[in-house]
Amino acid sequence: MRDFMDYIQLAFYDASKWNRDNSYSQLTTTANALLDFSTPERLKVNLSSLSTPHFATTYTLGTVGLIDGSISYLFTTIPLHDTPSRSTLIPLRKLVPGYRQIYPPSLPPAFPAADGRDGDLAIGGTEGDLKKKATLLHATLHLPPPTTLTGSFLRRLSPTTQLSLAFCSSRAPASKSAPQATLVTQILYDTGKYNSEFLFSTDNALFGFKGLWNFGPDPRKQNQNGGDPAREPCRSLLSLLSAGGEVYYSPVSSVVGLSTGLRFTTLPAATENPHSTFPYTLTLTLTPLTGSMSTTYSLLASPNLAFSSRFGFNVYSWESEMVAGCELWRRSKKLHTLQRNSSPLFAVDDLTWARRKMGLQDAAVSVHPERDGLPGIQRDDHDMHHHPQRPHASDSVIKVRVDQSWNIRALWEGRVKELVVSAGIALGPKSRSSLSYASSLAASGPGAAGGLSSYGWKSVGVSVLYSS
């Protein structure tokens, strides 16, 4: 489950009209959400609030033998009026990453002014409004010692350029020396057709570059056909192929890093046709220096069911990795009835998906699925901005993943009254150091099954979120 501050930061990206999917860093987002999710390892309580449209706070308290916590503050120059902040109104799919639908590349529109007006109005506004560019400040203090302070600064320099600063400072207990700090600077440039990121870190003077190229029509040239490239993307495209890579170099430690990857995904236009396939995403990533290769396949089998798998292989060590996972969303009967009795935008029942595939007409299906967002697909859809007070249709989700070593993780996330609860368990082989002397004697006794005693619980935890 995302932290409340991460949820607010994603809302800032949406309000500033920045496409976070068009980045090499997000190449395997769907597979990571379905396969690499984490489970709580202790009891954790989060109290959050969006007290004003510009200011948010979060207080976290956790216990695992020792009590620790954190305090977070966030400020944005863009008012987040349409962002639900109450834990009973936040769409659960906004807090739980899952299958994310990629949309056709489009030219970034003019960003809104700090007073929340549209980009066109901001361009025609005063010079003072133009100088108030979208900015976000975020800081978190982790207590008790070792005290760690983390923070970030985001600023939209232009419709195609964004500046990102992140720092981390920590001080060991009883240390009289100055706290150690690391600063990471990123400049992101997005044209819709391609995206580039330039990075510098003060840790070993690390330099980096990331790039992503989308094959197909250039959204910057769509205006030659009389359309608006910012508001009329290539909706006729059925699929999208993207290629990218990243390279790092540190002159201090002489460290070099290199990776490249491909992503093929279906677009919303491919699911509008009754004879089309289900939404799916394929990725291939290579790390030549270490000899690692990884492929993923993710499929949205229904609006509430998604599968994903990953196979990794190293050509030097001949080691392999196989991981499979799935997520299943559940809708309560009360919310399901409310959904069917509401407007056609929300009237999507369990058979809509099948009717669309069979070519049958269904009045409940929206005529603009690429605008409203398909149900079950991660998208900043219409109902979040225009119906923020409606309960979300999906109120709980179950995630399960397993690898070739039988490491199993299971996660349940849903609402209990006014709380968002996340409960998870992790099972798998235990290391020899974690086995007690008594269990070792039991395993060596008569009738002991070889290796079975080393398999068991790894962690169990619950995380609770309340926001206002």
Curated annotation (Swiss-Prot):
GO-annotated cellular components: ERMES complex; SAM complex
Alphabetical UniProt keywords: Membrane, Mitochondrion, Mitochondrion outer membrane, Transmembrane, Transmembrane beta strand
Keyword Transmembrane: yes
Main location, first listed in the record: mitochondrion
Domain note: Lacks alpha-helical transmembrane segments, suggesting that it resides in the membrane via beta-sheet conformations similar to those predicted for other outer membrane proteins and porin.
Membrane topology: Multi-pass membrane protein
InterPro entries per UniProt: Mdm10
Region described as Disordered: spans on this chain: 370-394
Name of the protein in question: Mitochondrial distribution and morphology protein 10
Biological process terms in GO annotation: establishment of mitochondrion localization; mitochondrial genome maintenance; mitochondrial outer membrane translocase complex assembly; mitochondrion-endoplasmic reticulum membrane tethering; phospholipid transport; protein insertion into mitochondrial outer membrane
Organism of this sequence: Ajellomyces dermatitidis (strain ER-3 / ATCC MYA-2586) (Blastomyces dermatitidis)
Protein's job: Component of the ERMES/MDM complex, which serves as a molecular tether to connect the endoplasmic reticulum and mitochondria. Components of this complex are involved in the control of mitochondrial shape and protein biogenesis and may function in phospholipid exchange. MDM10 is involved in the late assembly steps of the general translocase of the mitochondrial outer membrane (TOM complex). Functions in the TOM40-specific route of the assembly of outer membrane beta-barrel proteins, including the association of TOM40 with the receptor TOM22 and small TOM proteins.
